[in-house]
Amino acid sequence: MIVLGIESSCDETGVGIIDLADDGTMTIVGDAVASSMEQHARFGGVVPEIASRAHLESMIPVMKEALAQAGVERPDAVAATVGPGLAGALLVGASAAKAYAAAWGVPFYGVNHLGGHVAVANLEGEELPHSIALLVSGGHTQILEVQAVGKPMRELGSTLDDAAGEAYDKVARLLGLGYPGGPVVDKLAARGNRKAIRFPRGLSRADDLRGEHRYDFSFSGVKTSVARYVESAEREGRVISVEDVCASFQEAVVDVLTSKAIMACKDTGASVLLLGGGVAANSRLRELAAARCQSASIELRVPSFKLCTDNGVMIAAVASQLIHEGAQPSGLSVGTDTSLEVEIPLVHSL
């Protein structure tokens, strides 16, 4: 069975195609992605209207490329992200998916974007057991309890302000490093001293870890602290080491991300920690997560770099799992939801 997935929740237009075997084995046969990142760079962040227009322009070329890679003219099922994400961006992808499904006469599945990030784990390893997923990107920073791919997830914690990726972008802007901030901060941090400056770790005090925000994050404080450090240096005429600032900022972020994720694994008895989202490509996050997982006897699963960022393959993957388990299609009348809850893997009505 050939399952096609469309991703358009933010600034990537992705079409992925999976060959789903009768035993549930999934093989990637098509994967095409177009990004509008360069169009957003001069604004220092994603502009929803620009993202929506870019999806419109890219959808057909990306679709043709993925189908050509797979060597098929039409799939047996079509899936699309219907939430969470940017309203206009979601509408473009979901509308295209439903139009293709209607034209091809195949069922449509409206799936959860976050479930897609979890589903990629089954593409590159054994079936995911009871796990904790740490999803980190420019739009999301969440700790989720996962029983299995395609099943309702439970949110244990999330950011109360900026997402981690958003904090990277804002700090990069403060330092004049451009957009997106994640890759350049990570690169410069590798040459800096991560102990040079002690930036705050949000919601990591003893009282926080005992209370309702045990698994929650806050990155506005570290962002503000970096801004004050830079402003103070400018006032005093001091030359700062951008590499040290990047390394110290990054350490503050990944320290709290990994410590809370490991804590969630221990508290829930989960044997696996899964990293997902664009920030999962960060070298220091991977390094520290690996060290802390090894120390805690927890298995770490990290997708390949290409599958960390938004893509259509992850949407095809979660749909394939649902189809294999006998889930009914969504129907063409299903809408989109910018704040779709993680407990909903497949949408039948909104």
From Swiss-Prot:
Binds 1 Fe(2+) ion per subunit. It comes from the Bacteria. One of its GO terms (cellular component) is cytoplasm. Substrate binds at L135, V136, S137, G138, G139, D169, G182, D186, N282. Its EC number is 2.3.1.234. Fe cation binds at H113, H117, D310. Gene3D superfamilies: 3.30.420.40. GO terms for biological process: tRNA threonylcarbamoyladenosine modification. Its cofactor is Fe(2+). The keyword Metal-binding applies. InterPro entries: ATPase_NBD, Gcp-like_dom, KAE1/TsaD, Peptidase_M22_CS, TsaD. Pfam families: TsaD. It catalyses: L-threonylcarbamoyladenylate + adenosine(37) in tRNA = N(6)-L-threonylcarbamoyladenosine(37) in tRNA + AMP + H(+). Belongs to the KAE1 / TsaD family. Required for the formation of a threonylcarbamoyl group on adenosine at position 37 (t(6)A37) in tRNAs that read codons beginning with adenine. Is involved in the transfer of the threonylcarbamoyl moiety of threonylcarbamoyl-AMP (TC-AMP) to the N6 group of A37, together with TsaE and TsaB. TsaD likely plays a direct catalytic role in this reaction. This is tRNA N6-adenosine threonylcarbamoyltransferase. The gene is tsaD.
